[in-house]
């Protein structure tokens, strides 16, 4: 064995490549070993350093891959064990054990997290060269007993199913020990680069290779100053020193110092020496030179998005200077926090990148499909799960519009559960759903699922056969091929499909002869899919590489950007959270001889120093270290390592917000520039200098010119929220000339509530989602129907009998039967409605001097100027003197307020008076009023009554009164009825004023509607809060930001309120 160390200013790779070349020139076969995470990049670096740029004598690979070169022909043809297969084996083992067999873990038998921890422990045991019987000294002896039972049973299953329990390194080591590879290894040289420690498995293999190979050469970075130190605790080279010292002591070799021809910039070397002096308690009498600072930058940004955008701009600048994407490396302090953001931002700046991390399959449509399938079976055809299966795009041949229509109907009819999905859809609504089409679609969905879900407990092989048959029926494979929109997506789908078929194969192999329920089968496949990962190789090498900063090696790229280096992530603190604690691992590690657990937490300090050292020397030209103030919406501090750099004299640059300028980094990329222009166009103006304003004025003028050529535009507005007028063509279609504009009292109220709401409801005809479950609208229809029947009954039957008959016949109507007899909740609603009817009906019995002229009367009121107002009057009453009035049933409390009417928010009663005047063309003297009747079951607080007497009954009837507008002329006739006339009496002239102003409201609204420009202007009564419909989900209206756009209502003092509003009405209606 040969041990080599060198300073950070030299290239260890060049030194080891020279050693490899010498061995290759002598006829030896050379394996150049790199860590798993660096083998691809190391191969490119090694081949670059070779004069011939390639050779068959030097193979750059990993330990595991090297073992396959030697054992590929002699290895037994057994099944391969991966994490998913291991999890299935442990699940099968736990199935065969009873809870009482496992005192410590019996309650966790079906826990997926516990099974994952078992898999991790089993892999750790293999890497540590330990068996489950070596787990002595645990905190609780029963833990070892349980683990022995579980793992031994799992290993028995592996033997039965012909799985290879040995890892590739174990198989390689066994072949070496048996002497099967002596001839090959005698002609082999092993070169090892990039390691600072070996696992127990690698350590054992290395001892065998050292005895059988021609030579083993290992290199590591250690400074000569550190190598000569006797006390190395806390030294930045502590990990490498321990690594070399252990090997030197074990193999009785003295490490040799070497140098390379390539010497990196002295700025990095001087920074390293300062860093080393800080941690070995020595002194230096110099500082970084001014020109050294040109190679380092410390950035501070407010949050991650700004940080990534600054990096993207800097990368674009490097390209402008002539460098290539492959010269740039981006390191992330927290992969999970940055992974979702960095992709879209780099795409915006048109920067191709490769993320050096396996992607989880959990977000792929195939995994979502399998998860929805499993949940559909487990939760008995829950609607959300069935729809998620369809929306994955992998079930059957359905268009998006078909799926939307199916979803709309199932929500309306509340279809959930197998019983409802299995029956034909028969319920319809006013929207007239295409039931024939929906039933055909229902059958295409239900039949294959029903065939699969009716599977009873049976052999796993039979379940897999039925599952595959189901997947063939729904054309899963064909649909999977149709998902991809690009070559990259094709490659991703191929990798996902391969993992899926591997999981099915493993399940068939392990559980083929075991009896299982379908739910267990689907749950196992789902778990395997959700935990699986895949990796896609970039289509070109000229990309920006992105990876975690703790995987970096010295001198990786010319330009390195390390971002997210906050105190929480730099340095990283790693802790085990498995079935064994670190204390238990330490006790087990007392057994040596190549057998030991890796305890990451015990090596945090020296590993973090080694990582920081590699990071500070990762670049060969320029290193940028960046830290956000806020990461994952949490404030974080500077890393202690960055604070050391600041003490060395490196300035911390506050990058601030991404204000646009005319620097190359801001305007050098068209796509990024356009996106920033749009972003600025949506926000408040920022302060600019005169020079900036002039520049951006010219740029905007040029951009608009280019956008016009592409038929695009940048919208401008004086308000944060604005709307565009409808085009002339649309106005002509929506409001054709010669055809009256149809309005109603409800439509007018909506218009004056918020014009944009009118546009959505009556121009676009958007409606809320319907439901078969009764709501306030259906409740109102029921009450109307009962009272309509009751008032039509002119027989001599007692009133109570009439009421019972009206309720009975209304309940027998098919529509109300479907609505109110669907479930217990609907039946309860019906019982409450019947109570309301019985409570309200006596008011009709008391007013015997009233004659009902008509009910549910349709009317069309001509307002002039091509405006036609339509509606339905619930009831027209006639007093004994022949005067007519209108009753409008309400399921909630309503009362006419002249101020609300003036502001256009309560035109219903006055509109009905105008309609009645047109229907019965008599003068105003023959109208006694228009009123609301609140259909209710009055609630009284009995605490306020001293005794149960007539006052209680009077209070009930007081709540059951007509409230609205009444003619002062009919005051005497109204006094004997249940009419609340206080502050509600109007003279004939005042009634005429109300009618005239009502017409003015319609004309004013119609004029605005026909212009086709609808404002977002919900009303406010006080200028502080908004009471109108804000439609936040659509308009993004915010009261604190958009109060200026709200319509302020006219309000007047309560004193003389009626007279003042009538004066305003006369004035405005005459204009």
From Swiss-Prot:
Keywords: ATP-binding, DNA damage, DNA repair, DNA-binding, Exonuclease, Helicase, Hydrolase, Nuclease, Nucleotide-binding
EC number(s) given by UniProt: 3.1.-.-
Cell inner membrane is among the record's keywords: no
Gene3D superfamilies: 3.90.320.10, P-loop containing nucleotide triphosphate hydrolases
Gene Ontology MF term list: 5'-3' exonuclease activity; ATP binding; double-stranded DNA binding; helicase activity; hydrolase activity, acting on acid anhydrides
Alphabetized SUPFAM superfamilies for the sequence: P-loop containing nucleoside triphosphate hydrolases (SSF52540), Restriction endonuclease-like (SSF52980)
Cofactor(s) this protein cannot do without: Mg(2+)
GO biological process: double-strand break repair via homologous recombination
InterPro entries: ADDB_N (IPR049035), DNA_helicase_suRexB (IPR014141), P-loop_NTPase (IPR027417), PDDEXK-like_dom_sf (IPR011604), PDDEXK_AddAB-type (IPR038726), Restrct_endonuc-II-like (IPR011335)
PANTHER family (UniProt xref): RECBCD ENZYME SUBUNIT RECC (PTHR30591:SF1)
Alphabetized NCBIfam families for the sequence: rexB_recomb
Family as reported in the entry's similarity comment: Belongs to the helicase family. AddB/RexB type 2 subfamily.
Cited function: The heterodimer acts as both an ATP-dependent DNA helicase and an ATP-dependent, dual-direction single-stranded exonuclease. Recognizes the chi site generating a DNA molecule suitable for the initiation of homologous recombination. This subunit has 5' -> 3' nuclease activity but not helicase activity.
Note: Despite having helicase-like domains, this subunit does not have helicase activity.
Complex formation: Heterodimer of AddA and RexB.
Protein name: ATP-dependent helicase/deoxyribonuclease subunit B
Organism from which the protein derives: Streptococcus pyogenes serotype M12 (strain MGAS9429)
């Amino acid at each position: 064995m040969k041990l080599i160390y060198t300073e950070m200013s030299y290239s260890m790779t060049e030194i080891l490549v020279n050693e490899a070349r010498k061995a290759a020139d002598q006829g030896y076969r050379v394996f150049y070993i790199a860590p798993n995470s660096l083998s691809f990049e190391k191969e490119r670096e090694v081949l670059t350093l070779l004069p011939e740029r390639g050779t068959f004598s030097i193979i750059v690979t990993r330990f595991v891959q090297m073992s396959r070169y030697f054992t590929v022909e002699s290895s037994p043809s057994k099944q391969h064990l991966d994490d998913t297969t291991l999890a299935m084996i442990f699940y099968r083992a736990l199935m065969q054990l009873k809870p009482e067999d496992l005192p410590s873990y019996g309650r966790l038998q079906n826990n997926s997290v516990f099974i994952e921890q078992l898999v991790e422990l089993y892999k750790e045991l293999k890497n540590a060269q330990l068996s489950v019987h070596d787990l002595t000294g645990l905190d609780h002896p029963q833990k070892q007993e349980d683990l022995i039972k579980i793992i031994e049973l799992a290993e028995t299953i592996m033997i039965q199913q012909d799985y290879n329990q040995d890892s590739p390194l174990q198989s390689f080591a066994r072949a070496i020990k048996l002497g099967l590879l002596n001839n090959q290894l005698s002609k082999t040289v092993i070169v090892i680069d990039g390691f600072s420690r070996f696992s127990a498995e690698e350590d054992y293999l290395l001892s065998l290779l050292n005895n059988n190979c021609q030579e083993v050469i290992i290199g590591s970075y250690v400074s000569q100053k550190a190598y000569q130190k006797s006390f190395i605790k806390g030294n930045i080279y502590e990990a490498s020193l321990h690594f070399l010292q252990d090997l030197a002591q074990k193999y009785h070799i003295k490490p040799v110092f070497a140098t390379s021809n390539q010497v990196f910039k002295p700025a990095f070397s001087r920074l390293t020496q300062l860093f080393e002096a800080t941690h070995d308690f020595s002194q230096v009498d110099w500082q970084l030179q001014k020109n050294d600072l040109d190679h380092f930058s410390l950035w501070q940004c407010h949050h991650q998005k700004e940080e990534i955008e600054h990096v993207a701009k800097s990368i674009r600048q490097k390209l402008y200077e002539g460098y290539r994407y492959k010269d740039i490396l981006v390191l992330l302090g927290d992969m999970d926090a940055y992974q979702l953001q960095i992709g879209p931002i780099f795409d915006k700046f048109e920067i191709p990148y490769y993320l050096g991390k396996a992607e989880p399959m959990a977000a792929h449509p195939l995994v979502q499909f399998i998860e929805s399938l499993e949940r559909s079976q487990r939760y008995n055809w829950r609607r959300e799960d069935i729809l998620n299966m369809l929306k994955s795009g992998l079930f059957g041949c359905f268009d998006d519009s078909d799926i939307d229509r199916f979803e709309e109907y199932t929500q309306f009819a509340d279809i959930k559960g197998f019983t409802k999905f299995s029956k034909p859809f028969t319920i319809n609504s006013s929207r007239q759903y295409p039931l024939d089409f929906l039933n055909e679609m229902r059958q295409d969905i239900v039949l294959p699922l029903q065939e699969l879900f009716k599977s009873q407990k049976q052999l796993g092989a039979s379940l897999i056969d039925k599952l595959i048959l189901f997947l063939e029926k729904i054309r899963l494979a064909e649909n999977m091929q149709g998902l991809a929109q690009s070559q990259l997506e094709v490659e991703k789908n191929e990798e996902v499909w391969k993992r899926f078929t591997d999981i099915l194969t493993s399940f068939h192999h392990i559980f083929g002869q075991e009896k299982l329920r379908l739910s267990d089968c689907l749950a196992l496949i789902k778990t395997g899919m959700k935990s699986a990962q895949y990796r896609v190789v970039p289509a070109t090498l000229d990309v920006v590489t992105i990876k975690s900063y703790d995987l970096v090696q010295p001198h990786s790229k010319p330009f390195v950007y390390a971002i997210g280096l906050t105190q929480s992530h730099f340095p990283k603190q790693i802790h085990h959270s498995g079935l064994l604690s670190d204390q238990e691992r330490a006790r087990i590690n007392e057994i040596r001889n190549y057998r030991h657990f890796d305890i990451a937490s015990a090596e945090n300090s020296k590993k973090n120093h080694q990582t920081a050292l590699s990071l500070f020397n990762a670049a060969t030209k320029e290193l940028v270290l960046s830290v956000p103030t806020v990461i994952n919406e949490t404030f974080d501090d500077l890393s202690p390592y960055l604070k050391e750099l600041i003490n060395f004299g490196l300035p911390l640059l506050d990058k601030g917000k991404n204000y646009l300028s005319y620097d190359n980094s801001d305007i050098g990329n068209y796509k990024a520039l356009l996106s920033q222009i749009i972003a600025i166009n949506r926000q408040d103006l920022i302060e600019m200098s005169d020079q900036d304003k002039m520049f951006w004025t010219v740029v905007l003028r040029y951009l608009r010119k280019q956008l016009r050529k592409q038929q695009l535009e940048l919208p401008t507005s004086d308000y944060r929220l604005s709307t565009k007028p409808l085009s002339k063509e649309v106005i002509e279609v929506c409001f054709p000339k010669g055809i009256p504009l149809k309005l109603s009292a409800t439509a007018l109220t909506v218009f004056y509530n918020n014009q944009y709401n009118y546009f959505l409801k009556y121009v676009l005809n958007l409606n809320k989602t319907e439901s078969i479950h009764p709501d306030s609208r259906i409740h109102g229809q029921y009450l109307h129907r009962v009272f309509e029947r009751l008032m039509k009954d002119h027989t001599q039957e007692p009133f109570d009998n009439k009421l019972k008959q009206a309720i009975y016949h209304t309940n027998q109507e098919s529509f109300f039967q479907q609505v109110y007899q669907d479930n217990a909740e609907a039946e309860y609603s019906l019982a409450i409605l019947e109570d309301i009817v019985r409570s309200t009906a006596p008011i009709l019995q008391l007013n015997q001097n009233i004659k009902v002229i008509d009910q549910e009367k349709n009317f069309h009121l001509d307002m002039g100027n091509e405006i036609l107002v339509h509606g339905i009057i619930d009831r027209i009453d006639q007093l004994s003197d022949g005067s007519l009035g209108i009753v409008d049933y309400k399921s909630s409390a309503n009362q006419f307020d002249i101020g609300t009417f003036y502001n256009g928010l309560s035109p219903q009663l006055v509109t009905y008076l105008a309609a009645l005047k047109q229907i019965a063309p008599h003068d105003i003297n023959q109208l006694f009023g228009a009123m609301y009747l609140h259909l209710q079951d009055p609630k009284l607080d009995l605490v306020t009554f001293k005794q149960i007497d007539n006052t209680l009954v009077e209070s009930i009837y007081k709540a059951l009164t007509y409230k609205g507008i009444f003619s002062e002329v009919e005051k005497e006739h109204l006094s004997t009825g249940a009419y609340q006339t206080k502050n509600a009496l109007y003279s004939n002239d005042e009634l005429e004023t109300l009618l005239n102003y009502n017409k003015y409201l319609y004309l004013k609204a119609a004029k605005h509607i026909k212009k086709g420009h609808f404002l977002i202007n919900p009303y406010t009564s006080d200028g502080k809060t908004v009471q109108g419909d804000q439609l936040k989900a659509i308009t993004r209206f915010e009261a604190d930001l958009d109060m200026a756009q709200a319509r302020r209502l006219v309000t007047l003092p309560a004193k003389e309120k009626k007279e003042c509003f009538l004066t305003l009405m006369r004035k405005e209606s005459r204009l």
